[in-house]
Amino acid sequence: MARGLNRVFLIGALATRPDMRYTPAGLAILDLTLAGQDLLLSDNGGEREVSWYHRVRLLGRQAEMWGDLLDQGQLVFVEGRLEYRQWEREGERRSELQIRADFLDPLDDRGKERAEDSRGQPRLRAALNQVFLMGNLTRDPELRYTPQGTAVARLGLAVNERRQGAEERTHFVEVQAWRDLAEWAAELRKGDGLFVIGRLVNDSWTSSSGERRFQTRVEALRLERPTRGPAQAGGSRSREVQTGGVDIDEGLEDFPPEEELPF
């Protein structure tokens, strides 16, 4: 089993004023909406900007410390991890991949350029949006092709986490790869270890029942297959791309309602 690695690094602008509240047990929860624009290279060598909005959750004493100090538009660095949660609602199982902040620091905004969305909310241009994961595939990769012939692969990654004083937890992350990277990933199999470097994106769609659904996933920019022991002495296989995805709307302007989010 691959060693678990689960780190998220974000630099963006606070799209709204942070929301502070407490659980019935008195635990402080600070929810932040961080917004930015990634600069990606397209197939023809040109550059394009892709907007993103990520909800970040900070708990406990740090939440209380920053709750009254942060405001809309402020630039913030977040180091944290992805946390997988499950719950049931009206007899249906739901899940969420949440960004849990471990550290947060406000940043000097001198020389930084912002953009505004249609609601006047700020986004940081040339932001930071990076994810580093290591885990094992939960299923064989699913490879398909778009009508334009672009390869896209979906992978399920199980990341084990053991924190001091806590039981081991497993976080399930959906990973998507494009083009040559997708075709390389299609050769992997369930149970294989995989190291992923990518960017965090959000999807939304309408279910067959008419409900709006959301999913947070990782768009892979680089994949490495770790090898352990003489059985895999052929060396690790790796693949890297300069950019991922196609021109789709990845900057979500809304999020799941609070009643959909467990804590």
Swiss-Prot record:
Listed GO MF terms: single-stranded DNA binding
Biased composition (Acidic residues): 247-263
Keyword tags: DNA damage, DNA recombination, DNA repair, DNA replication, DNA-binding, Repeat
Gene3D superfamilies named in the record: Nucleic acid-binding proteins (2.40.50.140)
Motif Important for interaction with partner proteins: where in chain: 258-263
Domain SSB, chain residue ranges per copy: 5-108, 128-227
PROSITE patterns documented for this protein: SSB
TM regions (residue ranges): none
GO cellular component terms, semicolon-separated: nucleoid
PANTHER family: SINGLE-STRANDED DNA-BINDING PROTEIN
Family annotation (HAMAP family): SSB
NCBIfam families registered for this protein in UniProt: ssb
Function recorded in the entry: Plays an important role in DNA replication, recombination and repair. Binds to ssDNA and to an array of partner proteins to recruit them to their sites of action during DNA metabolism.
Protein name: Single-stranded DNA-binding protein
